[in-house]
Amino acid sequence: MSIFIFPVETARPLLVLAAAALIIFPILYFLYLTVYRLFLSPISQFPGPKLAAWTYWYEFWYDVVAEPEYTFKIGRLHKQYGPIVRINPDEIHIADPDFYNTIYAGSGRKRDKWDWITRSFGVDESLIGTLGHDEHRIRRAALSPYFSKQSVRALQPLVDRNMGILLGRFREFAQSGAPLKLDDAYAALTNDIVEDYAFGKSENRLQAADFDPSFRDAMLQGGKAGHVLKHFPWLMDMLRKLPNSMLLKLSPAMGAYSQLQTNVKKQVADITQAHQMHAYDKTRRTIFHEILNSKLSDYDKSTDRLWQEGEVVVAAGTITTAWALGVSTYFVLATPEILSRLKDELEAAIPDPSQPLSLLVLERLPFLTGVVQEGVRLSHAISHRLHRICPDETLVYRADDREWRIPPGTPLSMTSNLVHHDERVFPDSHTFKPERWVNDPLLDRYLVAFGKGGRACLGINLAYAELYLTLAALFRVYGTEEVQGKDDIGTLKLFETTAADLVITSDTVVPVMPEDSKGLRVTVHQ
């Protein structure tokens, strides 16, 4: 056997060539990427900053370095470039309320999701993480019956029972004189309701002394971390391999989010085990017990996938509805004219406040509906833009006497914040005006907090039921020093809280109060 050894004079040129290749190839790739993105890309002709078209680092700066505020930067870009803007190398953003239903079309037109965004949540197999249109439709069909209007109306006793607990806590705070943190209380209310419906039991956060905001806070922390994970998806796999104790030290946001996921996994695993052993209450209709009885594939019913669905159902059913309740409550308490008109309508519709409320009756009350809709509009539900991809359809957008043809496969997005503050649709858009919905019922088409089309929020009916029932139960028996009803049991007073506490100042996917805010607080008097 012989051993071949390159002479030094032969090896040196090879090493030089290898070193040159290591330098030249990245430069060539960089030049190619620059030329392609700026001049050859199918969306190169769309308006927008060249830096955003050239590199994702532009978005990274506004997502991570300059706080999560790319949502607001996009709004400024539209003022500069017009209603259609290229906001990164691959994505087009549109700010035109009349085009919303085209992008977010019904299930008859294919709409996929973009993995560059969905991967940041770590729930790739959930409904919100499912990329393909057809697979999403199958998975959604298994869940839809449990969120229909009929199913939600059957849940009213669950909502009423939890609202009764919350009103009992109001009496406790009236006796102690301590400020009540309504944002925490509402998050506890919505969380107890959705967990009970999803898993058959809740964490009873309403009965915790501080309303146990841990779940809500963990989701908000996860939203903050999501911006980093969007740009560096490999971090998710790496962080998941770390124990929670270490993760909490390295990244409190990801640690809290990981612990939340662990808790949901246990809930789903317990349900799966009970189902396999037939050791559960068959008289109670809960979401995940029913899914296990559905015709979904074995994988779609596996614990590995269902915990992701569980996290999304509980998170979406907790945060967005609670925030809409908080926004509505603040503006009703802060505006005597609105409170007076609302209480007059509620007293006429509910002569005896001790009797159970009727959701059907409440849904027909025009001013209460206006209060609910304004709360939803100004809470926005999702602060981040929503993405869709039309895989086999060229969308045509017309603006300023120009026609823009958007190629199939292009990620498209719109943002509810921009739609809800479009002054052409909602004049004086930053003012809480329930009467705008009374005077123009056609405005409903522009209320996009829960999305539209085949991928709209699955829990919209449950959210509205909670909004109607909670606001009606609260303001039927509580007023303020200025506005009181004949059957009131007490008054509420805003405590060191202003409209500035409700302004969304950063994009953490879901709305969040400013960091220096002490929360939506009231004092209760009886």
Curated annotation (Swiss-Prot):
| UniProt note: phenotype after gene disruption | Leads to complete loss of terpestacin and fusaproliferin production and accumulates preterpestacin IIa, IIb and IIc.
The UniProt Biotechnology section states that this protein is used in the following way, namely:
Fusaproliferin shows cytotoxicity against pancreatic cancer cell lines and provides a new chemical scaffold that can be further developed to obtain more potent synthetic agents against pancreatic cancer. Fusaproliferin and its analogs show also anti-inflammatory activity and can be hit compounds for the treatment of inflammation-associated diseases.
> Oxidoreductase among the record's keywords?
yes
Known cofactor(s): heme
Keywords assigned by UniProt, alphabetized: Heme, Iron, Membrane, Metal-binding, Monooxygenase, Oxidoreductase, Transmembrane, Transmembrane helix
According to its UniProt record, the EC number is 1.-.-.-
Q: Which domain of life is it from?
A: Eukaryota
Where is this protein found? Membrane
Q: How does it sit in the membrane?
A: Multi-pass membrane protein
Pathway it works in: Secondary metabolite biosynthesis; terpenoid biosynthesis
Any one Gene Ontology cellular component term annotated for this protein: membrane
Transmembrane stretches, start-end: 13-33, 312-332
Q: What does this protein do?
A: Cytochrome P450 monooxygenase; part of the gene cluster that mediates the biosynthesis of the mycotoxin fusaproliferin (FUP) that belongs to the class of bicyclic sesterterpenoids. The FUP biosynthetic pathway starts with the enzyme encoded by FUP1 that combines a C-terminal prenyltransferase domain responsible for the synthesis of geranylgeranyl diphosphate with the N-terminal terpene cyclase domain, to yield preterpestacin I.
Query: What is the designated name of this protein?
Result: Cytochrome P450 monooxygenase FUP3
Q: Which gene encodes it?
A: FUP3
